[in-house]
Amino acid sequence: MRLGHLFFGTTAVATASSRTIDMRLMTYNIRLAVGVGGPGEELWSVRRPLMTSQLNHEAAGRPEALMCFQEAIYPQVQDLDEGLGNEWTYVGVGRDDGAFGGEFSPIFYRPSVWKLEKNATYWLSETPNEPGSVGWDAALPRIVTVARFRHDSSGARIAYMCTHFDHIGQEAREQSAHLLVGLAGEWSTHNNKSLPVFLGGDLNVTPDNPAYQTLASDMYDAKHMVPEERRFGNVKTYTAFTVDADDDTEIDHIFVRDPAGLDWVSFAVLNTRFEDEIFISDHRPVVVDFKMPSQAEARHLG
């Protein structure tokens, strides 16, 4: 598995261009809005302003930031869009029908910084192009949103994949991992130039799970790209809306397919509960910072 500290990067960046792009990627399961909250859970109307403040803080001064979310039903997507302001927009559809039904896995970006060149939604099933399809032993439809962006001022490209694996079906999780490995490969080149492909999401698996290991055999966990002294915060990403750490798990991850040329800065699992004792979500956001070459020519194949 590709878990070691691999420091590609600084030399490759310097030879291609003295300029780099300061990147921040986030993945965050925001917990879908429900009519009646469970133990420890506040309603979305209470959590929403806290989450908006957190997101605005984490993206402030980082124009190239890309943020992906899970469990966002359409009204929540609209709330995030409104809370982040006019400088942001998003790409993504509902998993039930490929339109507005069911949970989204949206990717938010600033269109003044990134131009959306291509995007697609695939269902994690034997028929990935069939909206609403349920794969293998999954309990629900599951999707991955994929988007390729071009940096407006430099032409550099990056692809981001946002997904949410099934919480019941182990076969579905393993097969979904194989599907995403293949998709990451398909999205890894453009006009004979390679580009970094990132995968963020709530995978509902810990690192000892075969589904995680399938991803780690072909991609790199961003956490392990960053030296330990530059990792911050929690290890566990799911809290179940409780303060008891015994039921916390590490199930939210960010992977990268090809880290060559990237200079890794920091990794963090952020807090979601403060003095007001309100959980913003039952998941903690995962954030990785890195620098990437600002010229597309830096990653020419051959």
Where are these regions (language model features)?
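Structured beta-strand-rich core segments of catalytic domains in phosphoester-bond hydrolases
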Residues: L66-R157, M161, F165, V269
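Metal-dependent phosphoester-hydrolase catalytic domains
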Residues: E171, G185-F198, N204-G302
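Active-site beta-strand/loop signature of hydrolases that rely on acidic residues for catalysis
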Residues: R24-I30, M51-L80, F108, A147, ...
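Residues that flank catalytic or metal-binding motifs in active/ligand-binding sites
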Residues: I21-R24, N86, G101-F104, P141-T145, ...
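Short, solvent-exposed loop/turn segments at secondary-structure junctions
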Residues: I30-A33, Y74-P75, D96-G98, S112-W114, ...
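N-terminal, active-site-proximal structural segment of metallo-dependent hydrolase catalytic domains
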Residues: R2-G83, D97-E103, H178, T249, ...
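Short catalytic/ligand-binding loop motif for oxyanion handling, primarily in non-cytosolic enzymes
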Residues: A33-V36, P75-Q78, G98-P106, E117, ...
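Alpha-helical scaffold elements lining the catalytic groove of polysaccharide deacetylases
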Residues: E42, E171-G185
